[in-house]
C-alpha cells in the first residue's frame, strides 16, 4: 500500500469543504467546536511534510472496497492522505507515524466497506471510536464534562433549556450533532485520534488521558492558531512536548538514578502512582481542574485552543496522585469479597448457635441435658445479624483506607457506615437485653417475642448484606441519572446477561447454595453437636504443672473445642467450592449437549454428514453463485485438509490415497466424476477410521474434532470479500525460534540421557516413519535411484536406510538438515511451529476464496502466476501476521539467522521490534524506536532489512513485566477490526482456520446496521459490543507423560468446560490465548492488557476485567480450537503455578477486583469469585484446614494418652451415664474427625470430576476410564496435592512479601534429572517444611489415637514431602542417586570461604532477603545480586503471616505438651513435674548454644587471621564446616535429652519436639524481622565471619555494626542448618527402600513418561574413566549414606525401645523428668458437669 504516496508529488494540500471556525469566546468547549465548525478555506500554511515523504500503493487494487465501491467514497484515499498530512504538519506528529496510521485507517475502512457502503463504514467507525453510544471518548466526555452544570459540554448552546438538561436529553443532543457531522469532519476526528494513539507509547495504557489529549489537539487544530505560520509548532512536538513529559513521570515513579544508572525504586504498589492512578485523574471535571501549568495556572483556565500548546508546560508531578492504595494486606479481601464472608460466617453462626445450646445454658448438666429458654436460643442465633453488620462495616472501613478521600469519584461512606452501625446495635441490643435478664424473666413471652423478632431481623440483615453490592448499600443510582458517571461508565458498566443466561445463572447458584447449606448442616455442623456437648461440659480433674498450676490444663477441652469450631468453619467454606464445581460441570455438560458438542452423536452419522456440513457451514453463503456442484467445492476443501496432514507427516502415502476425493471416469462416455473416500460412507466407519489413523494419533484427533465441531451451531458466514480483516499478534522475547541441528542431535547436558531427536522419535514414531519415507523418496529422486522402496521391503538396503532412521538424512546438505530441524521444531514449543500453524489462515482464505469464486480462473486467463497473485492479494487484504520481537535488534547470530529464515519462508510475516538510534553518543539520552519490517523489505548494506516504519518512542516502553509492554509496542502495527492474541508456543491447523469467517461472525458486526448509530432507532435496538471471543485450546503435550497430561487436563476443563458455562452466565474473563479481541473496543480502553510492574503480572485477565467493567461482552466458541504447548517438567509446571498464584494475589490488591467485588450483581459476583479468586482461596483454606486438623489431632491425642476415655454408642440416650466412672467422652470428636477427613478427601477427589465429565462428553466412556486410570497409576493425585500447596503458599507469600514477577518457564521436554539440592532449595520453603511439621504431628496422632482414616493424611503429607523427588526423572537410579548425594553434601557445606550462589548459605540468604531486603547503596564491592529486587516487606504486612500465624501454632502445640505432662487423675500435688520449665530449657538451649558456637568460631577466626594470613580463606572452610556439623550434633543431643526427660516415652518426646520446632520457628522469624537490617548485595559478611577478614569486604563505615548483625544471622543460620541437614536426610532415607527395588528406574520412567519398556530412554554412555570415577563416588557416598542411616536409627529409635524413666530418682532433683504415664480412673470425681 505504501506505493501510493510516491505518485503524489507535486499535489497541493487538500481543499477542505469546511472553513475552520474561530471562536470569539476562548472558553468555548470542544464539543461545541465539534458541533459548530463551519466550512473553512484552504490552509496556506507551509508543510513540514508533504506527499513526497510517503510511499503508498496507488494502484487500483489498493483498498478496493473503499476505492472501487459502487457508492463513491465519502472521503477519497487522496483526501485521507491530505487530512493526515495537514494534521501531522499542524500538530507535530512523526512522519512514519502518519504513514503507519494512513495504512491503519485505510485497512480499517476497507474492512468495513467490504460488507457495507463506504459512508456506513466511516459512520460506524466514527461511532465506535468517537461519538457512538459505546465509544469510550463519548463516555469520557460526559463523565468529565456533564456533572458541572453543563458548562463545558453545552455552555454555548443557544437552546434556553440547556442549563436544565437531563443526561438523556444531553445524550440525544450529542447524537443529533454527531449525525450532523460531515464525512470529512468525521474522518479528521478518526485520523487525529489514531495519530495521537499511534505515537503515545506507554500513554496508550491510560485511555482517558489520551481522550483529553485528543480533545486538546482537536481544539487547537480547528482554531486560527493552527493556521498561523509564525506560531507553527516544531516538528515532533506531540512526542516531545505532550507524550514524553507524561512518560517521564511514569518512568520516574519506577526508576531512580543511582551511581549513574537507572535502578528500580524500592516501592510497593501503594507508593507508586501507576497507569490507573494517572488515568483516573481525567475521569472528572474536578480532576481536570487540578492540571496545573508550571506557573500554577490551571490548564482549563486557558482558552481551549491554547491548551494543546501548553501541555508541555504542565507540572504533571504536582497533578497526579494515588486514587487507590494497593496496600499489601488481607483487608482487601474483606472489602472485595465481603458478601462471601457474610454469607458463610453468618450461616455458620446460625447452625452452630442452634446446635450449641449447652454453651449458653445456665447451670447446664450433661446428665440432665437441660435446654436454654427459647428466647435465648432465638436471640443467640439472631446474633448472626450482628456478625453480618460487623463484617460489612469492616469492609466499608477498609474501603475508606484503600480509596483516598482526595479522589473525586470516591463515594460517600458515612451513609453506609451509619446504616451498618445502626443494624449492628439493633442486633446486639436484644442479645444484651435477654441474656442480662434473670432466668425467670427469660421465660417471659415478651422476651420470646423479642428473640423471634431479633432472629428474623437478623435474617433480613444477613440476606441484604449477602446480596447487595457494597456500593449499593444505601441508595441506588438510576441509569438516567447524571450523577457519578465516571464510576458507572468505567467501573460498573456491566453488560446485562441474556434472559437465558440470567435464568441459568440464578438456577445454577440457587442449586449450589441450597445443596451447600443442606449438606453443610447435616454433614458438618450437626455432627459437631455431640462434641460440643461433651467438650463444653468437660472439666479435667487433678492435673497441674509445677509452675503454671492447674488453670491451663483444665482449659484443654475448651481449647480443643475452639479448634473444632475453627476447623469446622474452614470446612464450611470448602464445600461451597465443591458444589460449585459439581453443579457447574453438570450445567456445562448439559449446555454442551444443547450445542451439539458430544461424542455421543452416532459415529457413522457424524462422519457421514461431514461433506454436507463442510458445504453448509464453511462454504455456502447467501450471496454465493452456484457454478459448480457442491461436491466439487467440498472435494477441494477436504483434499486440502488431507494434503496438509500429509505434508505434516501425520499420514502416510498409502493412507492419503484412501482419504482423498478422486476423479474417476463416469458412466457417460467422456465424462468424469468425483469419488468420495469410503471413509465417509463405509458401514464400519469406526473400523475404517482405526485402519486409516493409528490409535490416539494426531490425525485421528484432528479429524474427529473437526467432524464433531461441524455438528455444532455455527454462525452464518459472509463471502471472503466481505470478511473483516484481522491480525494474529505474537509477542516474542527469548523463546526458541527454530531448533538448531546441534540442539536436536546432541544431549542437552551431562545429566541428560537422551537427545531431543531420539525422544521425539519415541513420542511420534508414526510421524517419524512418514517423515523418513518422504525424505527417502526425495533423496531417491535427487539421486535417480529407482526401486528403493522395493529394496526396503526386501531388506536389501538396510545400511542405506540407517542414517535416515537415525537422524533423518544421509547427506548433511543444508536442505536435508533443515528438513530434520523443521520436523523437530514442529513437534516442540517453537516460534516456527506457531508461525507455520497460524499462517494456515492465509492458506484457508485462499482456499475459500478460490472455491467461492470459480470465475477467478477466467479473470486470470488460466495463468497460474496471476491466479496466485490474486489469491495472495486477497489473503494479505484480510489477514496480517505480526510478531513482536522485542529483542530482534540484539539477537545473537543464530537467532538473527532463524528470524531471517522466517522472513524468507513467510514474506508477509511482519516483525515489530525495538531499535536504538545508532548515532546516539555515550552521554546522550538514547533514542529508541518502534520498528516494523517484513519479508518484502530490502536488505541494506549492513545486512539488516530496511524498515517500513520507524517511529521514535518517548523512552524505553518496557517498564512492566515485559509481555504487555511488548504487545503495546507493536499494537499500532496490527491491521483490521480484530486481533487474535497468541503465545509463541502455539499451533493451528488448516481445518480450524477454515472456520475463521464463522469466528469473526461471533462479534455480530458482519451485517450492515439498519439505522445510523446516531439515530434514536439504533439506540433502542443497540446491544453491547462483543469485546472478547474466547476459544478452546488443545494442549499438544498431553501425550508426553503424566505431567503433560495433567497440564492438558487442567486446560481442557478450565479453558473449555468452565469457560463454556461462564460465558453463558456472564462470568467469563479473558484468560489469554487464543482469544480474539475487538480492536476498536479494546484499544480505546487501554489496550489488550495492563502493564504495571508486578501488579499486572497476569496481564491477560485484566483485558477481560476492562471489558466487563466498561460495557463489553465476552463470549466463548467451542467449535474452534488451536494447539497450545504447556510446561512439561515438574519444576517448570510449578514455576507456572507460582506465577499464577502470585498473580492472583496481585489481582486481589488491584482496583479491578475492588470494583467488581463491590458492584457486581449477586449471581455474577459469585461466578466471578468462584471462577477466579475462589479457586485460590479454596486451595489456601484446604491447607489451612489441614493444619488445623493436625492441631486437633495432637490436642486430642494428648488427651487420649493420659485420660480414661468413655465408651460411646452413637445412638445412646443423650442423658445416658458415662462409663466407666471418671472417664472423658472423646469418642464423638473422633467420629467428627472421620467425617472431616472424608470431606477433605471428597474435595480433593472432586478435582477429577470435571476432567472425567469432559472426557466422557467429548471422547467417550472408554477414553475417560483409560485417561483417569493412567493418571491415577502415575500418582497424579499426589501431584495435585502438591500443586494445591504451591498455589496456596504463593498466594500467601505474595500478600505478605510481594515480589510477583513474570516467570519464564521452560518449554522443552523434562528428561533431565534435576539435582536434589536444587529441588530441596526450591521447594523447602513452600512445601517441605510445612509437610514435615504436619507429618510429625500426624505421627504423634497415629501413635496416640489411631484411625484408619489417617491413611489419607499420610498420603497427603507424604505427597507434600516427596513430590519434588517422585517426579524427578531417574531420581531412583542407583548410581545417579549417590552421585547426586555427593553434590548435595557439597551444596550444604559450600560457600563458607568463597562466593558461591549455588549453596545452602546462598539459598538461606536469598530467602531471608524477602524480609530484610537489600541495601540500596553498594559500598566498595561489586554487587553479586541482581539490581531489580522486590521492595522490603512492611512489618505490619508481615505481622499476620510471619508473627501471628507462627505464634498461634506455637500456642496450640505447646498446650497439648503441657497437658500430656500434667498427670490428670494424680491427686498427689507433690508429684507435679516442671513440664513448662522443661519445655523452656529444651527450646532455649539450642538457641543459646548456637550463639555460643557462632561467637566462639568468630573469635577463633579473628585470632587465626594474623597467624595464617592469606591462608585464612581456606581455613574458613574448615571452621564453618566444623561449626555446622557440631550444631547438627547439638540438635541430636537435645532430642536425646528431651527423650530422657520425658522418660523415654516416644509419643511425649515427639510432641515436645513438635513444640520446640514451633518455638524455634517463631523465634527465627521474630529475630529476622525485628533485629536484622538490610542485606548487602555481596556475601562479604558471611565470608568474613569464618575467615576473620573484615577489611576489604566493602562494608565502609558499617564494618563496626556488621559483626553484630552477622552474629544474629549466624545464630539463626546454625539452627536452620541443623534442621535442613536432618530433614533432608530424612527425605533421603525415605527413598532408601525405593532405590533398592530392582528395575525401579524403568518403572519410574513408565510412570513419568508413559513409555513402554521396549521404548525406554537408554542409559547415558560414559567413558571408562568416567565410569571408574562414578563407581568410586558411589562406594564412598553409599557408605556415608547408610552409615548416617544406621546412626540415625541407633540414636533416635533404640533409646526409646530400651530406655527407662529416671523420674523420682536422685537424678531428678528438680522434678524435670516425667514419670511413666498412668491412666487413672476415679470413681469419686467426674470429668463432666
UniProtKB/Swiss-Prot annotation:
It catalyses: [(1->3)-beta-D-glucosyl](n) + UDP-alpha-D-glucose = [(1->3)-beta-D-glucosyl](n+1) + UDP + H(+). Keywords: Cell cycle, Cell division, Cell membrane, Glycosyltransferase, Membrane, Phosphoprotein, Transferase, Transmembrane, Transmembrane helix. Component of the 1,3-beta-glucan synthase (GS) complex, composed of at least the alternate catalytic subunits bgs1, bgs2, bgs3, and bgs4, and a regulatory subunit chr4. Its EC number is 2.4.1.34. Its main location: membrane. Alternate catalytic subunit of the 1,3-beta-glucan synthase (GS) complex. Synthesizes 1,3-beta-glucan, a major structural component of the fungal cell wall. Required for the assembly of the division septum and maintenance of cell polarity. It is found in: Cell membrane; Cell septum. GO terms for cellular component: 1,3-beta-D-glucan synthase complex; cell cortex of cell tip; cell cortex of growing cell tip; cell division site; cell tip; cleavage furrow; division septum; fungal-type cell wall. SMART domains: FKS1_dom1. It is a multi-pass membrane protein. GO terms for molecular function: 1,3-beta-D-glucan synthase activity. The gene is bgs1. The modification Phosphoserine is found at residues 23, 784, 788. This is 1,3-beta-glucan synthase component bgs1. InterPro entries: FKS1-like_dom1, FKS1-like_dom2, Glyco_trans_48_dom. The chain crosses the membrane at residues 378-398, 416-436, 448-468, 503-523, 546-566, 577-597, 1180-1200, 1237-1257, 1337-1357, 1440-1460, 1484-1504, 1515-1535, 1550-1572, 1678-1698. One of its GO terms (biological process) is fungal-type cell wall biogenesis. Belongs to the glycosyltransferase 48 family.
